[in-house]
Amino acid sequence: MNKSLETLAGRIIAGEQLSVEESIALSASSGTDAFALFLAASRVKEHFLGNGVDLCSIINAKSGRCPENCAFCAQSAHHTTNAPIYPLVDEDKLVACAKEAEAAGSRCYGIITSGTTIKKGEELDRICRAVRRIRETTSIAPSCSLGIIDHETAVTLREAGVETYHHNLETSRSFFPHICTTHDYEEDVETVRVAKQAGLTICCGGIFGLGETAAQRVELAMTLRELDVDSVPLNFLNPIEGTRLAGSKLISPLECLKTIALFRLILPTKKIAVCGGREQNLRDLQSWIFFAGASGTMIGNYLTTTGRPAEQDWQMLRDLELAVGGCCE
């Protein structure tokens, strides 16, 4: 390993925090330095989290007609896409999909709804009933991603049996106005704080390839460190026709891996999962995510796009001789 990066990994393992300046400098790593960066991140990950891999799955429980104007999102009402449009699925569907996710090997199951927030009353009650049934009939850990929520809703979810609340910040505070103008960044930050105060585990990350700079990626990581989130999903833009970012170029596989490694070094003890856009952006280097600091990945389908068969991911893990753990354990 590059001696300076070996020393850096040792410092992080000893409890030091990576500075903004160091992080930005590392983001420019190339050639053999980039591979040394991956090795340093892998060493840090193995020290704090071992050699296991966490697998999670999601259901798009309510799709389309979202009033928010996030530039990347196929479900935004501000875009014209082929994304499906339907109301909240019924309770039986939520439970059945949890059982399918468990059968596929996932240990964490996310119920995700489009829209700014979930409606109190029937929508929230239906999800809570489903969560109770999931807890009674499976061993999978239920999580929810229902938009911006208040303390009352967070407590209701926790009491129903939800373990984790997922709410991405998507990008840095400084770049957010270029991506979304229909709500303020602070509303997302406050949702994370509210869910955490209610006793929920926090899953919060972002999406890359939106046009942000390397410094803005570091800015997001530093915000997540300040918020002390528990799990960090990293997504890479898969441009969807009809969205504002439809013409964007994919990030190169090595750039994706450098981003993963950087987040691992900034957030050494946190669970980091590579999720949306994995297949399109990483291509033949998908398996490298676990040697760049990732501790998990999403299997199955995404919100509006299809993932590869779960068996392919299981074969990848067998080939790498990696053990599978539980993302919410």
Curated annotation (Swiss-Prot):
Q: Which cofactor does it need?
A: [4Fe-4S] cluster; [2Fe-2S] cluster
Q: Name one GO biological process term.
A: biotin biosynthetic process
Family affiliation: Belongs to the radical SAM superfamily. Biotin synthase family.
- Name the Enzyme Commission number(s) assigned to this protein: 2.8.1.6
What is the annotated quaternary arrangement, including any partners? Homodimer.
**Quick one: which gene encodes this?**
bioB
Q: Please list the residues that bind [4Fe-4S] cluster.
A: 66, 70, 73
Name the chain's protein: Biotin synthase
Q: What residues does [2Fe-2S] cluster bind to?
A: 143, 203
Q: What is the lineage of its organism?
A: Bacteria, Pseudomonadati, Thermodesulfobacteriota, Desulfuromonadia, Geobacterales
- What is the catalytic activity of this protein? (4R,5S)-dethiobiotin + (sulfur carrier)-SH + 2 reduced [2Fe-2S]-[ferredoxin] + 2 S-adenosyl-L-methionine = (sulfur carrier)-H + biotin + 2 5'-deoxyadenosine + 2 L-methionine + 2 oxidized [2Fe-2S]-[ferredoxin]
The record's listing under PROSITE patterns reads:
RADICAL_SAM
Q: Which PANTHER family match?
A: BIOTIN SYNTHASE (PTHR22976), BIOTIN SYNTHASE, MITOCHONDRIAL (PTHR22976:SF2)
List the pathway annotation.
Cofactor biosynthesis; biotin biosynthesis; biotin from 7,8-diaminononanoate: step 2/2
Listed A to Z, the keywords are:
2Fe-2S, 4Fe-4S, Biotin biosynthesis, Iron, Iron-sulfur, Metal-binding, S-adenosyl-L-methionine, Transferase
Cofactor-binding details, from the entry: Binds 1 [4Fe-4S] cluster. The cluster is coordinated with 3 cysteines and an exchangeable S-adenosyl-L-methionine. Binds 1 [2Fe-2S] cluster. The cluster is coordinated with 3 cysteines and 1 arginine.
Radical SAM core domain mapped to chain residues:
48-278
Molecular function via GO? 2 iron, 2 sulfur cluster binding; 4 iron, 4 sulfur cluster binding; biotin synthase activity; iron ion binding
The record's function comment reads:
Catalyzes the conversion of dethiobiotin (DTB) to biotin by the insertion of a sulfur atom into dethiobiotin via a radical-based mechanism.
